[in-house]
Curated annotation (Swiss-Prot):
It holds the Pfam family Anticodon_1. It comes from Rickettsia conorii (strain ATCC VR-613 / Malish 7). HAMAP family: Ile_tRNA_synth_type2 (MF_02003). SUPFAM superfamilies: Anticodon-binding domain of a subclass of class I aminoacyl-tRNA synthetases, Nucleotidylyl transferase, ValRS/IleRS/LeuRS editing domain. A motif ('HIGH' region) lies at residues 53-63. It catalyses: tRNA(Ile) + L-isoleucine + ATP = L-isoleucyl-tRNA(Ile) + AMP + diphosphate. Its cofactor is Zn(2+). Its EC number is 6.1.1.5. This is Isoleucine--tRNA ligase. The lineage of its organism: Bacteria, Pseudomonadati, Pseudomonadota, Alphaproteobacteria, Rickettsiales. Belongs to the class-I aminoacyl-tRNA synthetase family. IleS type 2 subfamily.
Amino acid sequence: MTNTKYYPEVSSNADFAGLEREILKFWQDNNIFQKSIDDRNGESEFIFYDGPPFANGLPHYGHLLTGFIKDVYARYQTIKGKKVERRFGWDCHGLPAEMQSEKELGISGRLAIANFGIEKFNAHCRASVMKYANDWEEYVTRQARWVDFKNSYKTMDKNFMESVLWAFKELYNKGLLYESMRVMPYSWACETPLSNFETRLDNSYRERADKAVTVSFVLSHPVTTTTGSFKEYRILAWTTTPWTLPSNLALAVGSDIDYALVPKNDVCYIIAAYSVSKYAKELGLSGEENFEIIKGSALQGLNYKSLFDYFENHPNSFKIFAGDFVVEGDGTGVVHMAPGFGEDDQILCESKGIELVCPVDNSGKFTKEIPDLEGLQVFDANDKIIIKLKEQGNWLKTEQYIHNYPHCWRTDTPLIYKAVPSWYVKVTQFKDRMVELNQQINWIPFHVKDNLFGKWLENARDWSISRNRFWGTPLPVWKSDDPKYPRIDVYGSIEELEKDFGVKVTDLHRPFIDELTRPNPDDPTGKSTMRRIEDVFDCWFESGSMPYGQAHYPFENKEWFEDHFPADFIVEYSAQTRGWFYTLMVLSTALFDRPPFLNCICHGVILDSTGQKLSKRLNNYADPLELFDKYGSDALRVTMLSSNVVKGQELLIDKDGKMVFDTLRLFIKPIWNAYHFFTMYANADSLKGKLNFSSKNVLDVYILSKLKIAVQKIEESLDNFDTQTAYHAVSAFFEVLNNWYIRRSRARFWKSAKDTDKQNAYNTLYSCLDTMAIAMSALVPMISEAIYKGLRHCEERNDTALSGKSNIIARKDTSLDKAISGVSHKIATALSVPRNDAISVHLCNYPTLSDFEINHELVATMDNVLDICSNSLFIRSTENIRVRQPLASIAIISKHNNNLKDFEDLIKDEINVKAVIYRDDLENYASKKLSINFPMLGKRLPHKMKEIIAASKKGEWEAITGGLAICGETLNSDEYKLVLEPYSHIKGAASFENNSSLLILDLELTPELIEEGYARDIVRFIQQARKDADFSITDRILIEIISEFNLSKIIDNYGDFIKEQTLGEFAKNFTPDYVSKVALENHQIQLKVKKS
């Protein structure tokens, strides 16, 4: 008779990378991704915003991590019945694109770009920015992430740019924009200002050593409050930016700070009293002197002589003022003011009528206003300035100052602070509203809401949105070129531009947009012209415009946008609280008075195994494609998304991929092993599994109950955006499925009779694999697909199982069935997956098992049985007693033993003991010990921790209703745990996980027990020989054992047992198919086996 195989031949050592490539081809050939969207037409939608990356570099592990998270929730919401569009997007404009183009073209700086030609430069940017688009698609596809590349949006597309113009004009009309000359973080390497939040991206602060200099400024008049008289009065100021001293226009002191008048020769030095000791050497002090003290308020209004003559006639300058930003700490208590290079400096000087000076050009070099430093980069000028101060007699001290200093996020060069003209969004006008709207957002981790993001919103500042660069959406602002006839025009659409300028606008980029000019309508002479300002948008404004920009709102898709805003979900790494998340929030609040998204995950960063940032230069990470080809992408997905990185913490990943291999071994393989077991034995028996939940077998009921619990836990976890818990639920289920259900059901699968009990076992295992394949399909999309397809290798789902009618014949009552008698158990035959004809697991509906009722009593009891068995096996391991060695007994000591007696045979068989003994005198074997949760209790009672610890060790506590009394305090349930500990003289003991029961293994070995252990060893040796000989699991064999060790007694007593377990018969004088040599108690044994 032909053996019909209903399932594919599955190898236990699968090539998972090859398997994944087959699945990817299946998806592509059958257009599964598009089907998953089309099948949900008419259903409610799950709105997902895909943050646009730059395509001028290859994706790294951070991109893959974000992509995995995006894919999990998009797939999950799809099988939950939602329509989930996944349109990819590209960030195309801004510094990243320009810097890459400059590198490729071999040019650097604004002047070089202008000489090269803006049109040619931007054309190169346009081509360069999508350089790695195909590589991105390869990586994203290989990681099993489904996105729509064909309809991707690009921030450089005309439609997207027009929506950005609309947003700008809307803000302008609302009075939320203004133009100003203000001091900002400035990248001299990129020749552009940066927003304050850009200095907070990617840990842009670096430790830097600068030369700090203390300088003496000569007062123009004596300080009248002193009792003595001096030839000269000098006030000391300290700065870490000597290069700003040529631009000094004022000094600031603290009104309430004490200042000491320190005499040296005929000069009186004025310095904050708290700093005098720091300058003892320079001022010739012994430390015993007493000085006259005055308040800073007494210094206000005094004039001093300029350090240099560059701006000595600058109006209203060179006075001492009070500044509330001057506090005690570093320095001298005196701050030098250069309003062109400091925010506080500018604000204070502006209030005193002092106009700023800024003798530094766009590239960070001094201009001709400082002739002896002209053309010198500011940081390179420090030494020359210090030398000049020494020559003039104004220098007092130079020291090395190490501090965290902001660097450019693109070039990693140190920033300067510099006054530049810019357009600003009045974020401070509506920041309180942003704080309110933030309360509508669910943040993961939760603390981001009120801390990382919330605090940032509370301290939000006006946002500089203009950049004096080339490749970007141009600011739609035209100004009159004649200040006599001022006029500003702001445009919010192409239609408005075409109407006013009378030309067809086909490209909004520079230089084409710059060529649009027209006569100034407000100039009666007709001589002045309206010309566009040169600035382009900060690229963060464009990425923040993504929700409406991708839809070309409000010019098209108005209803679509309103239905798709805000997003249900977005995810990026935590620094985007200062980046994309923030700009989305600013623009959404200002334009729509709504939060831009409702759920947001802030994941952590991936570092190398030593905690360093992943870097091509350091060569400290493997190419992700290499890992995919070696272990598969599902393994990398699990590695990342089951870790704390999804909770905002760091993930250290090794270059060699050991972590991913461990995931493959510990997570993926157990899933595959269960599937392999099913297909192997089902094919051997020519049986088909059916989707059926009606078996009364206690192991079947237990594993199906555990299945539903796992399915519910996965659903609950993913509903709460918690992949970590979801993966744990999958792993925990397959641990029980493999190491308990399948192991305890082996006899049912192995027996030759194809009875109802055997069919029930196959149905139950099939139902578990089928259901979990769907439930975990978002978490491991490719192995789930492989299992799902394999289970449907030769047929559609079982119609009977789905119809709700059962054709399963009831088993006769057994001892195991009695274990669930009297316990409410609703027989179920259906799984809630109505789309039973789906060709892909990702086209199914999430399983609910609504017609199957969990047997909680059975689960609790069986979990206790597992606890007993796992503890017993651990004790065996500790005592070096192999599992095949029988033991006399196990004692279970508990007040509640009745529910375990029905499982006595199972316990005896699993842990290999002859008897189970029950006791209830727990107090004779163990006692409760108090374990304190120090982090939790320490928050509430830090002052009593020492006393509580001492009392807990002495046993001076009492369990009371609702808690535990100790040291006059009542501890809450999450602040302590009572642990059951066996007395030290009790051997072979362990407490249950619930700390209410104890087990004790009898570890004494009698000769009879040892003999039986040898018999079991022989069985294992024969089974291994069968496997090594590549025999089928159904092959019957002949066995011959040749040994220097006398085995006759063992064979006489246990021969039948050995033959039954190995499908063998003892024989002699045959030609073996396979021979092996093994050791039994240091004696050599030769095994010969042959198919019979």
